[in-house]
A protein has these predicted regions:
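Conserved catalytic core of the tyrosine transesterase superfamily
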Residues: 1-304
């Protein structure tokens, strides 16, 4: 018999009417240890909350696609910085949960079945080179795509995550001729950081705001029908990656900003950590890892 906490597990998450009972039944029908049961429940809740926020709709098991599971995997790895083993554990759980739903006839297919686990590899993040960035921004300018220019600029100049861009509201922006900033908010605790916006970024955001559709929404990035979710922002980024022949995703732009910042401000990990919103400076230190060529060039400069 399902326990009270299992039935109420999804409280606070926008879900369909059947979902709480389905999750409780899944947990109840498997012989999990109590501690494992709670961890699995929290993993499902984490996915449900992400789904609702990313797609701006209630979490309903029949609405989940393989694309959602792939995006969630990327969210855990790139946005939340979870270890490969932690991400893979979540994928195994989702595959089991949706597999059970499929076997019970609640969904037509298991959306997690074909999603591959991540391979263990060094975490040194890569960034775009300057020529690639110029090519992307040139294509945006040629198409006079002011919304794309603003979104890409926030990632390239302010190190914004895709969730930062989606969650940014009009009152979070301070823009004037001499300076400007954006306040990004994260998660249930409304953790926030205020990041200065360089002149090119301020100009890009201001130009977009002047043509932004006048809909009743506080969100900065909107379409004619309402605020853009993570899918909408990701589509913008991937569109210009395709145009430029680059495997482009939102977090690659954030990595690029971090690399350029350290090139111009060598060793200033504290400032970069504040901009990126890293609570652990060891995460920021990954951007200091050098390639063999860079190490060789640095060694050649030694002179006694």
């Amino acid at each position: 018999m399902a326990k009270n906490w299992e039935v109420n597990l999804l409280d606070g998450v926008p879900v369909g009417p059947e979902e709480p009972a389905l999750v409780a039944a899944f947990l109840d029908q498997h012989d999990f240890a109590e501690g494992t049961r709670r961890l699995i429940g929290l993993d499902i809740k984490q996915f449900a909350r992400w789904f609702a926020e990313a797609n701006r709709e209630k979490f309903m098991v029949g609405r989940v696609t393989m694309r959602d599971v792939l995006d969630f995997r990327d969210h855990l790895r790139r946005e939340k910085g979870q270890a490969v083993a932690t991400v893979n554990r979540s994928l195994v759980l989702l595959r089991r949960f949706f597999g059970w739903l499929f076997e019970q006839g609640h969904i037509a297919a298991n959306p997690a079945k074909g999603v591959k686990q991540l391979k263990r590899q060094p975490l040194a993040p890569k960034g775009l080179d300057r020529a690639q960035v110029r090519r992307i921004l040139r294509e945006v300018e040629l198409r006079q795509d002011l919304r794309a220019n603003a979104a890409l600029s926030l990632m390239l100049y302010a190190g914004a995550r895709i969730s930062d861009v989606v969650g940014l509201e009009l009152h979070d922006l301070e823009l004037n001729e001499r300076s400007g900033s954006a306040t990004f908010r994260q998660g249930k605790g409304n953790k926030q950081r205020t990041v200065p916006l360089p002149l090119p970024c301020r100009k890009a955001v201001q130009a977009y705001l002047e043509v932004r559709p006048p809909i009743k929404s506080a969100a900065v990035f909107v379409g004619e029908r309402g605020p853009l979710g993570e899918r909408g922002i990701r589509a913008i980024v991937e569109k210009y990656g395709t145009i430029c022949g680059i495997d482009l995703h939102p977090h690659l732009l954030r990595h690029t900003m971090a690399h350029r910042f350290l090139e111009d401000n060598p060793g200033d990990l504290v400032s970069l950590a504040q901009i990126l919103g890293h609570s652990n400076i060891n995460t920021t230190a990954l951007y200091c890892q050098r390639t063999q060529n860079q190490l060789g060039e640095a060694s050649e400069k030694l002179n006694y």
